[in-house]
């Protein structure tokens, strides 16, 4: 599992309990004593593809659970929807969206870290099925996170793109790795915006059999899918608001001068 691999190389993760709902004898835990963790808690599917196959009223990408009754209700909804896979219940780490970090890496076909970059999240989407997806970020170098990411991916024998979500615990400054997505992230354009096209790196490796020196993305840019006013209103950290404003207009991958469609422009 992800948490086991992290533990083997000294990478920190939140405490968690894995619940296998595919086991017909499984009785999902509902109390703090059963879980060994206090409420509030966070719950999510271990395998996103399995979760995407089901649909039910009130479905959420990530569940924030305040008490045993809410947890029991979640298990009931999953059972009624026919969900038969693993689910994770984790301790809830405090802190707002700005405590999140995104790391994108490419491990080439020889197993070496060929590209890495990262961003500080300003805002995330808060729609129930989209929660956790960043909508505004500042690209920034985080060498400690890069080193830990490389250590983890090499240990796993990983190849290809990986996108990792990390949160800094405001209580003690620990950097906790939440998950690794075994693909390039939906917001990976922040790398291109900062000067490193991940597709070019992949094509050189897999098509041309060429590997340049490893690329570390250090340029700072504002990557944003929302109007500047949204950042100004909802980012509570004044210093971060000033940083975002100082970087100028945000780079939005949806805005392309080559796209002439009036309908498209109105839509976005």
Model-assigned labels for residue ranges:
Residues 2-87, 109-111:
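Active-site nucleotide/adenylate-binding loops and adjacent lid/helix of ATP-dependent enzymes
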Residues 64, 68, 186-204:
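Gly/Ser/Thr-rich active-site loops/lids in small-molecule metabolic enzymes
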Residues 65-127, 140-148, 168-176:
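Phosphate-binding site of ATP-dependent enzymes
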Residues 88-89, 159-163, 212-219:
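Flexible, glycine/charged-enriched surface loops at secondary-structure junctions
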Residues 122-134, 181-195:
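Glycine-rich phosphate/pyrophosphate-binding beta-alpha loops
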Residues 153-189:
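Conserved metal-phosphate-binding beta-hairpin within the catalytic cores
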Residues 200-268:
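Peripheral (often C-terminal) accessory segments that flank ATP-dependent C-N-forming ligase machineries
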